[in-house]
Amino acid sequence: MSAAKILSAPVAPGGTVGILGGGQLGRMLSLAAARLGLKTHVYSDAADAPAFQVCAARTLAGYDDAAALERFAAACDAITYEFENVPAAAAELLSGLKPTNPNAHALAIAQDRGEEKNFVRALGIATAPFAPVEKADDARKAFAGGRAVLKTRRLGYDGKGQRTVASADEAARAFESFRGVPAILEGFVDFAFEASVVAARGCDGAFAAYDPPKNDHENHILRRSTVPAPLSSAQADEAKAIARRIAEALDYVGVIGVELFVTKSGELLVNEIAPRVHNSGHWTIEACATSQFEQHIRAVAGWPLGDPTRHSDALMQNIVGEEAADWRALSSNGGALHLYGKSEIREGRKMGHVTWISPKTGAG
């Protein structure tokens, strides 16, 4: 294993930031980089990747193609990711060739729900109760009544790899439906609402956090984020402090998303960590001095972090599936429309988002 390369100097305008992954996050990162005079080179295994439409250079190859990854790295000054499920071998290879952030340790933690929860708890931060499940009988024994959620330890997002269960036998059957894939059984949290913190840490250790939004989900997919969330100033500060402790413990560089449950008693529980720009931070494009996408590029390119101050209240709503077909109405509803350039509309697929802003009314 090669030692990870460290960025010795900021990437100057005209330089190239490599982005592994070509989805909408890579697309918006590329647009933000261009505003700073930086080029992006996008690597994706999908010929119709949305980010290919807006980048300066592209590589179409598999994430297990070592030769293609090496050529990609040679063309970049720094490298980052737009999704967390990067194959470990690819992350290791790239980090030994060019400065690559977030680091491999952060990716490894975020790729495994069990490791993630153990990591967060070791920092003294609360999570939902959970137990590892390696076989059906583990699920049966771990079920403690009420409701619980069985989740695969790896490769879960937007509700994939999850089943809500209401009995020990149902938990066991759910595990069997996962075909023996390692899982965790998580106690169901009767939360008041969900929130998140999108924050950034720079190469110099500087930290900046955005105001937490309230997040509403439908069918396990984020539907809307509203800022400010109905949190007290103390809760908002606590949420940002949680994100900072996690980022510092990971020696993290880049933007990170920390998803939270807010219980009815006001307690904050960490649900998941996303080592990348986050869907619940899209509102920052219109409502903040520095968007999460510019902030991430600044961090991984070794630039000073920008100002995360929110100058407006915001409501961000995802455009999902067939809703994108009504683009005429979406383009005239008074919001800032972002369509991702995806070639095919599919049920449950995020096709874009709209953000509405209004005068700022709250502190957090």
Where in the sequence are the language-model features?
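Protein kinase-like catalytic core scaffold
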Residues: A208, I256, L268-E272
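Short, flexible active-site loops
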Residues: H220-P230, E272-I285
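Short, low-complexity Ser/Thr-rich regulatory SLiMs
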Residues: A199-C203, L260-K264, G341
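Peripheral (often C-terminal) accessory segments that flank ATP-dependent C-N-forming ligase machineries
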Residues: K5, P13, R298-G364
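ATP-binding N-terminal substructure of ATP-dependent carboxylate-amine bond-forming enzymes
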Residues: M1-N118
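Active-site nucleotide/adenylate-binding loops and adjacent lid/helix of ATP-dependent enzymes
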Residues: I109-S196, A200-I246, S358-P359
